Amino acid sequence: RLGGARSAALQLDWGQALGCAGFFTIALPEGDSREPSSLLRTGGRLLRFWLAATRLGLAVQPGLAMLMFAHYGAAGVRFTDDPRLLRDAARCHGRLRALVGDDAPRLVFVGRIGE
């Protein structure tokens, strides 16, 4: 029997992920900074994408925890006193970077899409 966070992860993350049509990322255009105006433009693009998907009968599910913990790992943010979780965040950063390469620092959204 699984309990606590493992059970929640299986139900909320893995189960949903296996049933979705695909995953996607949205990144700031090359050369754009993380200034508010750039982030707002990118947010507008994300909103248009999300609304278009909804019109097509598709659902979009954000997956922002991965981005948050990858950022914590990259920046060395001490979000907890638990050394295991700090190592996990650093590993999360490494895995994200392995998946998307040099685009990792520009990512602003990760999601899944499906019916």
Positions of predicted regions on the chain:
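Acidic, surface-exposed loops and disordered segments
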Residues: R1-E115
